[in-house]
Structure formats: C-alpha cells, structure tokens
Amino acid sequence: MMTMSDFPPTLTSLYQDQVEFQKLLGNTDIPKDDPNEMAHHLLGLVTEVGEVSQADKRWKKNKRNKHYNFQEKLDEIADCFIFLLNVCIYSDITPWQILNAIDRKINENKRRFKSPEKDEEQK
C-alpha cells in the first residue's frame, strides 16, 4: 500500500514550504508583488545557474574539463528552482498560474517545432 510519503511533493506544497521559510526570514507579508525582492532573487538565480555549470564542467570545449558531480549538480539545480519559487512569491504568482503558464509554453514550443513555417508567417 502506498503512503503519502511515497509520492513526490507537489509544486503547491513546495511553494507553501518556501513561503513559510521566507516568513521565518522576516518577510511576513507574502506572497506579494515586490520588484526589489524579486530582483534580489533573480540575481541569486543567476548565481545558482553558474554553480550548476561548475558542478558539471563537461560542457567546456577543451578536453581537460571532466569534472562532474551528480549530487552537487542536482543540489544546485534544486537551488535554482528555489530561487524561481521566490521570484514567483515576490511577483504574486501562484503555483496554479505558473504551472498553467509552463504547460501553455511547452505546448506552444511543440507547436512551433512541428510547424515552423506557420510561426514565420505570423511574424
């Protein structure tokens, strides 16, 4: 028999956990649209993206860079998602809104890939 702990967390539960954590840091009036806080977390996201590339240097063109640490890369990608959650929280974007936007954009990208000529005609 499966229990709740057998299922991965949902975006909504992760979002709520991150809101709780931000409140522990003293940001009690959230979620809300706060451009300054959003900008702070965007900068943090850029930093974390750089750390992903440091955890897996196989993307570099020279053959000397073979560094790859799966767990480190996984943790840095998780940090990126956390910063993206914060960007949503400080943009007053709900989990439902972001999931629907992601779904819409994926479908739009698939449509464009399947029919690139139609996309060019619309420009």
Model-found features: residue ranges?
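Flexible "arm" and connector segments at domain edges
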Residues: 1-123
